[in-house]
């Protein structure tokens, strides 16, 4: 599953690896990888594989789920497809409450006591997913956990999720993706070394000259 999804993401350009020409994230951090899972929306077979995979993760790890919640905005479409496959109610959660109307942060119904699984497109530092979890908890929901398409496997993300007492499962991850990229001849040994060094300590830019 992990390598299959990784292959899909690489093939459609949803994930780019540029260890020799790093991206700069909005945080200012240099990175050899950039992920834009929104591109999956334009590829029916890929998004269908993702929806099936997310459904499988949910059934395996969170069989008592009652509501599927998407993170705004990237998780909304995938949450909708998964909830449709599972015949479950769906809602989505904004990063913050609206400044007009009813001022909702949660759109759709997520009622007190309901068991919810959050669908996220990408786990980086875990911030947006945790914001979603906290909003649902404040509404009285029981958040069973998070499922996502991809994770960078960053220690900072793992630590934040653990601190928030939330479990998370991803369809694919950084390790599987770099392995598939190497198998496809998209990166060589020197590039793989840089990719491995970045994951160990993303904040240390020494990986750029590794």
UniProtKB/Swiss-Prot annotation:
Pfam families named in the record: Pribosyltran (PF00156)
Keywords attached to this entry: Glycosyltransferase, Magnesium, Pyrimidine biosynthesis, Transferase
EC number: 2.4.2.10
Cofactors that this protein relies on: Mg(2+)
CDD domains recorded: PRTases_typeI (cd06223)
Annotated residues for binding of orotate: 124
Annotated catalysed reactions: orotidine 5'-phosphate + diphosphate = orotate + 5-phospho-alpha-D-ribose 1-diphosphate
Pathway noted in the entry: Pyrimidine metabolism; UMP biosynthesis via de novo pathway; UMP from orotate: step 1/2
InterPro entries: OPRT (IPR023031), Or_phspho_trans_dom (IPR004467), PRibTrfase_dom (IPR000836), PRTase-like (IPR029057)
Binding residue positions for 5-phospho-alpha-D-ribose 1-diphosphate: 94, 98, 100, 120-128
GO molecular function list: magnesium ion binding; orotate phosphoribosyltransferase activity
GO biological process entries: 'de novo' UMP biosynthetic process; pyrimidine nucleobase biosynthetic process
Primary enzyme class: transferase
UniProt xrefs under PANTHER family: OROTATE PHOSPHORIBOSYLTRANSFERASE, URIDINE 5'-MONOPHOSPHATE SYNTHASE
Function statement: Catalyzes the transfer of a ribosyl phosphate group from 5-phosphoribose 1-diphosphate to orotate, leading to the formation of orotidine monophosphate (OMP).
Subunit annotation: Homodimer.
Similarity comment: family membership: Belongs to the purine/pyrimidine phosphoribosyltransferase family. PyrE subfamily.
Protein name per UniProt: Orotate phosphoribosyltransferase
Lineage: Bacteria, Bacillati, Bacillota, Bacilli, Bacillales
């Amino acid at each position: 599953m992990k390598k299959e999804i990784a292959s899909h993401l690489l093939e459609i350009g949803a994930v780019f690896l540029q260890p020799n020409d790093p991206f700069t994230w909005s945080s200012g951090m240099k990175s050899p990888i950039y992920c834009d899972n929104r591109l999956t929306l334009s590829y029916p077979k890929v998004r269908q594989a993702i929806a099936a995979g997310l459904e499988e993760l949910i059934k395996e790890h969170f069989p008592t789920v009652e509501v599927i919640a998407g993170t705004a905005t990237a998780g909304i479409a995938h949450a909708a497809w998964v909830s449709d496959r599972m015949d479950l109610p769906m809602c989505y959660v904004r990063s913050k409450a609206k400044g007009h109307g009813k001022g909702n942060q949660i759109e759709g119904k997520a009622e007190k006591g309901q068991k919810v699984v959050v669908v996220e497109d990408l786990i980086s530092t875990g911030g947006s997913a945790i914001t979603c979890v906290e909003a649902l908890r404040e509404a009285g929901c029981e958040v069973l956990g998070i499922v996502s398409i991809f994770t960078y496997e960053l220690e900072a993300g793992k630590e934040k999720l653990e601190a928030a007492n939330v479990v998370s499962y991803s369809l694919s991850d950084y390790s599987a993706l770099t392995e598939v990229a190497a198998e496809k001849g998209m990166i060589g040994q020197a590039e793989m070394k840089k990719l491995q060094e970045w994951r160990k300590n993303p904040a240390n830019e020494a990986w750029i000259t590794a």
